[in-house]
């Protein structure tokens, strides 16, 4: 199809980028070495626990085998695969999660990892579940559980069961999604007592394997009710007998919840049947044909995504051309820039992903002569630095977010930032207020947003540039092998913490070396805790992806945004493309 609205705006976007003159093999090798380390950690986490062979021999599939059968080939985008904030021994929080298409419709898919403690709730899992439901909420796409959950890991219940974002919170979130009209569909396998039972019952549609069960309490709980407050031999023997009796009367089987309560909508005899049942109900859900929202035919970028291994420097002190990165991400390497030349530290504008509009904000990299204007006015000269935020850039981003919100265009942020400008010049230029203004603009936009921390995410700039802190907007964030996230550079932090002590010790004639050692230890700690591996493990970003895999994640995000949007702006009623054209025309004269 090639008949689209307003072709003079959307099918004549300027082409950006150019072919590489040479490829930096050394830079690529450094990036790929980190990527390989991430791959190995991810694979080890997936394989930890009971062997795949053992599960298959018992008639069960693994979480990944179930996901592979359920999801359309080539569409799986893992999220939080390295997330393990509580250092669980198996390297994960006991679920496998991501975005994927099911019979052409995007969904958030969360599968219990039945290789580990029969899919038990472990520390960190509740927060990861909430991140998944947040993504479904932001994108207004179905949430699909492939459930096989044995309940709370009881010897760590205090880290799993209670708290504001604890074991019960996802059940409230499922109710919230249902009330928003966002369905939650679950395929239930195995034994699901207590926390697993509520996890089973809280979705919209329940589909079960014939051997599945769900219950308020499992056999162990039912048999272990004792008022004594301790266990003696008599109690132990009674527990043994109760367990023997309960094996023939397991709580919450298909006979109860299909045959009597009717909670199970459908029951299947095999693994494939449950997944086919999920697909059946996904097929019933409303979704726009993406052609409805397209402004152009889908195209691949003009340039190879593998070029990114050469373009993006592994050395954080080296600069590069952000436009060349963008040229490897967007359809046809086309980009309609908003207010080129104003606020030059920020690149803002419209791009296309699979023919669908997306608003883009990215940090320019490199030096900026005679900028910012507030320093020029004071000193008669100035040198701005790409990656830092100044007055004009903050104003421009506020305007751009507001126009994207008005035109209902989802947004992509590409961060490589050292923070917002500091000092009294910056204070007089109102940067503190303008940074918070951008947060206000984002919060009021009600837009779904995706954020990529390409290299540095630093200081308050990491918040204001569409970061994951914007919980009502940010659907998910990703990083790369070059990602670093910290409040400030380690050397800066060491100076901030110890400068006064050095002055005091020097004045007193004391040995400075112990303080110097502490400063260097802090610098090393910052380096460790800002690495891609740590960022993923701690959840500072939702996934570390390969350089050449950024576009598939952007495609998943943009297509999901247009699947079932809450509101629409007709193309011929949009303001942003017209503002871009008029600004460009005015500045040509």
Residue spans for each PLM region:
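Ligand-binding clefts of soluble mixed alpha/beta catalytic domains
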Residues: 2-589
């Amino acid at each position: 199809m090639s008949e689209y609205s307003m072709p003079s705006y959307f099918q004549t976007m300027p082409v950006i980028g150019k072919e590489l003159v040479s490829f930096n093999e050394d830079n690529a090798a450094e990036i790929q070495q980190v990527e390989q380390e991430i791959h190995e950690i991810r694979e080890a986490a997936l394989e930890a626990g009971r062997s795949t062979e053992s599960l298959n021999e018992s008639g069960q599939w693994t979480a990944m085998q179930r996901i592979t059968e359920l999801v359309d080939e080539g569409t799986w985008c893992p999220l939080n695969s390295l997330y393990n904030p509580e250092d669980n021994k198996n390297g994960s929080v006991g679920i496998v999660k991501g975005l994927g298409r099911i019979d052409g419709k995007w969904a958030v898919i969360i599968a219990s990892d039945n290789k580990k403690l029969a899919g038990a709730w472990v520390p960190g899992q509740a927060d990861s579940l909430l991140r998944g439901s947040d993504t479904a909420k932001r994108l207004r796409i179905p949430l699909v559980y492939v459930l096989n959950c044995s309940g709370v890991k009881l010897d760590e219940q205090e880290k799993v069961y209670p708290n504001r974002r604890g074991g019960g919170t996802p059940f409230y979130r499922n109710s919230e999604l249902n009330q928003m009209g966002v369905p939650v569909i679950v395929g239930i396998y195995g034994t699901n007592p207590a926390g697993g039972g509520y996890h089973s019952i809280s979705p919209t549609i329940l589909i079960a394997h014939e051997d599945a069960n769900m219950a308020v309490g499992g056999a162990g709980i039912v048999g272990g009710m004792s008022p004594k407050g301790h266990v003696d031999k008599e109690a132990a023997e009674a527990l043994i007998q109760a367990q023997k009796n309960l094996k023939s009367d397991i709580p919450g089987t298909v006979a109860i919840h299909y045959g009597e309560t009717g909670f199970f909508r459908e029951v299947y005899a095999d693994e494939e049947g449950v997944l086919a049942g999920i697909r059946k109900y996904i097929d019933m859900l409303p979704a726009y044909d993406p052609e409805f929202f397209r402004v152009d035919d889908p195209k691949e970028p003009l340039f190879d995504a593998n070029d990114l291994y050469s373009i993006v420097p592994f050395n954080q002190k080296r600069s590069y051309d952000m436009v060349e990165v963008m040229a490897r991400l967007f359809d046809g390497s086309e980009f309609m820039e908003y207010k080129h030349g104003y606020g030059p530290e920020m690149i803002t504008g419209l791009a296309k992903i699979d023919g669908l509009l997306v608003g883009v904000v990215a940090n320019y990299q490199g030096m900026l002569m005679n900028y910012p204007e507030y320093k020029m006015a004071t000193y008669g000269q100035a040198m701005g630095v790409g990656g830092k935020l100044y007055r004009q850039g903050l104003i421009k981003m506020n305007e751009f977010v507001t126009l994207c919100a008005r035109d209902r265009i989802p947004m992509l942020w590409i961060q490589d930032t050292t923070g917002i400008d500091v000092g009294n010049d910056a204070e007089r230029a109102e940067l503190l207020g303008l940074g918070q203004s951008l947060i206000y603009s984002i919060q009021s936009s009600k837009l779904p947003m995706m954020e990529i921390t390409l290299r540095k995410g630093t200081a308050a700039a990491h918040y204001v540039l569409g970061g994951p802190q914007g919980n009502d907007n940010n659907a998910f964030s990703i990083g790369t092998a070059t990602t670093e996230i910290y409040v400030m550079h380690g050397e800066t932090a060491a100076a901030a913490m110890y400068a006064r002590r050095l002055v005091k010790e020097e004045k007193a004639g004391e040995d400075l070396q112990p303080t110097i050692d502490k400063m260097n230890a802090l610098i090393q700690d910052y380096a460790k805790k800002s690495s891609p591996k740590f960022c993923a493990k701690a959840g500072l970003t939702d996934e570390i992806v390969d350089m050449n895999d950024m576009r598939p994640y952007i495609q998943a995000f943009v297509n999901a945004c247009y699947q079932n949007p809450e509101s629409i702006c007709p193309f011929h009623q949009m303001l942003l493309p017209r503002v871009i054209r008029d600004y460009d025309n005015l500045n040509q004269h």
